[in-house]
Amino acid sequence: MANPRNFDGVTVLITGASMGVGAATAAAFGERGARLVLIARGQEKLEILARKLNLGDRVMVTPMDVTDTDALTQVLHETRNRFGSVDVLVNNAGFHARGSAESVSAEDIGRMIDVNLKAPLMATRLALPYLRQSKRPAVINVASLAGRTPVPGSATYSATKFGLRAFGLALAEELRGEGIKIASVSPGPIDTGFIMEDIDSVTDLTFSQPISTAEQVAEAIVSLVDNQVRDLPMPRMSGYLTTISYLFPALGRSLRPMLERKGRRTKDRLKRERGKG
């Protein structure tokens, strides 16, 4: 097995790379010697990150929308031409329009499906021919605890993350014996702008679970490239809870009011600490 601390000569593509988990993942792979292809819509933020990483010609900045299949095709071709290989794909880009299923606009529903589900499926499909030529191939999907247990107020988002996990688990079986690692990490709340900047609209249930940092999720992503884990919830205790809720849905529903009260207290505390409450 390859040294999990050494990614010299390994090319890693990261979507949603400009901030949060994506930026932390870029730093984690970069400090281990990887060559990076940073993908996001905002060119300025990508260039700021590239300068901060200070990896010289080991970084390729690629501003694009992950839902653009032609652009995905082109970036894979350019990556191989520049770095000689495509080794690891991290499907991290995400979009979340919060609210009841009835209140979320049709446009936002479509955007969640396109960004959270269709884009990583297409990126993975397009990357597979390149990954088959790699000595250390892997696809790591960033899912969510909302893809392990349904979250009211995030119905479409939950559906996309359930779908992404299912795709990864099924694809891992399809590719059994080919040596391509397919895995998903399913974090709960993460201390990033993705939820913290709009804390009032985030469900109380979400904040019932321990909050991870972007760096913790990034380290989990790096570890998934080489270990035997296919489906990693974060933190593990939350994974146990979501499994219990899945196996015993009546029990899960009975626990929900208690968890929502706990989450409400956490939200109130966070708002006070950030001067928003």
Label each region the model flagged.
Residues 18-20:
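Conserved glycine-rich cofactor-binding loop
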Residues 32-49:
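Conserved glycine-rich Rossmann-like NAD(P)H-binding loop of the short-chain dehydrogenase/reductase
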Residues 144:
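Residue(s) in the substrate-gating loop at a strand-loop-helix junction
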Residues 174-238:
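SDR active-site lid
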